[in-house]
Amino acid sequence: MAKEKYDRSKPHVNIGTIGHVDHGKTTLTAAITTVLARRLPSSVNQPKDYASIDAAPEERERGITINTAHVEYETEKRHYAHIDAPGHADYVKNMITGAAQMDGAILVVASTDGPMPQTREHILLSRQVGVKHLIVFMNKVDLVDDEELLELVEMEIRDLLSEYDFPGDDLPVIQGSALKALEGDSKYEDIIMDLMNTVDEYIPEPERDTDKPLLLPVEDVFSITGRGTVASGRIDRGIVKVNDEIEIVGIKEEIQKAVVTGVEMFRKQLDEGLAGDNVGVLLRGIQRDEIERGQVIAKPGSINPHTKFKGEVYILTKEEGGRHTPFFNNYRPQFYFRTTDVTGSIELPAGTEMVMPGDNVTIEVELIHPIAVEQGTTFSIREGGRTVGSGMVTEIEA
């Protein structure tokens, strides 16, 4: 049989499994791929067993080693990319670095245990890094005889979610057994199909990158005699068109306005550049020395320059090439945003004396000059050009 063409007509959604160690995240991932392959066979829906998912390859993302398994599958309505990380540290790194941007996640909780410390931590991380939609899968229900006990566990999970500002009373909770489904028990297979229908319905279709407001981090600037100033870089999101009014944001206190008079890619003139394109944009009314690497070109009003923010950060271990020693309050490294380094100072949370390599922590940062940042912007922490940490902006303060 000929391979089916990749069907782009289906909306694409990124999800993942989160939850405490040994609660069944990887078994559930295997069960989803296997049950979909049995019930909705297609070239995309191929069963993956536990061992192949668990043996996730090491990836390096911004200098950090992360083990992550990527699987894909489809329902009748959607195409999914699903991430599953074997170790707790891999989840923390994945979420904080933005390596795995999830539109929603399935929180797996073993009914035999109820919520555990990493359940709480993954919920908090989801809240911090902007994973807005969680669905709960209460796993291993076949091992619990007592209906009341299941109700108590469900209440406990809902309360915990509400504590972190998720709609704990309303979000879907599905009770099943990933292992039984994997083994082919049709009752539990049906529950996996219910779970996927719920994911289809409950996790909204993500906004496409091209529908978001323009953001183009400036990498290089040059002037063309008689035509003006060109800024080049890779469009992070949105679309840039000839005659667009744009703003140049960051480094300087004030925002500058300009008009795009040309867009080119590979030396060819274009009408527009899209998210993901490497383009040069010709700007009217901007001198060569008025724009620099580290600034961004953005849709007017969509992003502002800031110097103070809260962030969730992961500090690399010595083995990852990070620091060998802890750091303390008022530590002053460089913060690398998109294309440039800016010095800033770190304030640790009350009661935290120091941060050890391998820790993740919420910090307050004050930069020496403003950068275009917003909730969800990722950054690296660097010392003398080497990466010692990775983080994400969770709250703007000034």
Curated annotation (Swiss-Prot):
State the similarity comment. Belongs to the TRAFAC class translation factor GTPase superfamily. Classic translation factor GTPase family. EF-Tu/EF-1A subfamily.
What's the catalysed reaction? GTP + H2O = GDP + phosphate + H(+)
Q: What class of enzyme is it?
A: hydrolase
Protein name as catalogued: Elongation factor Tu
Where in the cell is the protein located?
Answer: Cytoplasm
Role, per record: GTP hydrolase that promotes the GTP-dependent binding of aminoacyl-tRNA to the A-site of ribosomes during protein biosynthesis.
According to the record, the residues making up region (G2) are 63-67
- Give the binding site residues for Mg(2+): T26
Q: Which Gene3D superfamilies match?
A: P-loop containing nucleotide triphosphate hydrolases, Translation factors
Q: What is its EC number?
A: 3.6.5.3
Organism expressing this protein natively:
Streptococcus gordonii (strain Challis / ATCC 35105 / BCRC 15272 / CH1 / DL1 / V288)
Protein's UniProt keywords contain Nucleotide-binding: yes
GO molecular function annotation: GTP binding; GTPase activity; translation elongation factor activity
Task: List the residue ranges of the region (G1).
Answer: 19-26
Q: What's in the keyword line of the UniProt record?
A: Cytoplasm, Elongation factor, GTP-binding, Hydrolase, Magnesium, Metal-binding, Nucleotide-binding, Protein biosynthesis
What the entry lists under Pfam families is as follows: GTP_EFTU, GTP_EFTU_D2, GTP_EFTU_D3
Q: Where is this region: G4?
A: 139-142
Q: Where is this region: G5?
A: 177-179
Keyword match Oxidoreductase: no
Locate the residues binding GTP.
19-26, 84-88, 139-142
Q: Please spell out the taxonomic lineage of the organism that makes this protein.
A: Bacteria, Bacillati, Bacillota, Bacilli, Lactobacillales
Ranges for region G3? 84-87
Classify the main location.
Answer: cytoplasm
Assembly notes: Monomer.
One GO term describing the cellular component: cytosol
